[in-house]
Amino acid sequence: MIIRDSDFVFRPPPQLSWARRVLIKPCAGHTLPYPVTTSARLLDNIIRGIREISNADILIADGTPTGESIYPIYKSLGYDFHHVLMLDVRDSIFIEVENPLTQFYAVESFWVPNVVLRSDFLISVSPFKVRGDSGRFSVANLLSLLPVSKYQGEEPGGWSTLYELGIEKVLADLYFTLPFDLGVIEARQKLFYTDDDDPTKGDVEDYGRILVGEPHEADFEASQIAGVETEHLRLISEGRDQLEDQMDS
């Protein structure tokens, strides 16, 4: 679903009304504001929409690529919401979760923060970012939930061991292992940057839209808008067929 930004009011799906704990995962790994990170304005819109139908606990959680505290970044981005618990994933207990795909692409299991597993409804909220020829939307946004301490290589920080496996394959595996209920893509602006993985050096285009939907479907629509064929989304489509075959066998 694509909605004009000026008209956007977050209307949660009916199943959220049953949730006792809702986790919102923004893109908050940089101190720079939108479109590099998720805006406080959109998060506030989503929180207000949840409050309209639910008294659930609302949590916001993310982690930094350096493994340092994320709380100073939350503050710099203006993330100050009433009755919302702000969390740094590095403080979580991490539990190893098996990939449900028997023929996984790169990773057989992931270390996942327990706060995700203990939440009833999961929302990934990302900017509209395109890195080279691949979209970095709501599915790719999940990467920073993983512990840097377990996935960094010889150099401190980041998830270099996962990048070495092929990040597009890793993101497809992560989608199935960490299934989020909803993806929200903040496409008021579109940010395009090159393969050096530095979104602060990208080019920005105005677009004025918000995309909402199941994460793979919302991301696929965003990729079409961007004119790119995002590899991990293609792999997810194949993985869905594999899961159906597993269930039928």
Please state what every model-predicted region is:
Residues M1-S249:
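N-terminal and secondary-structure boundary signal
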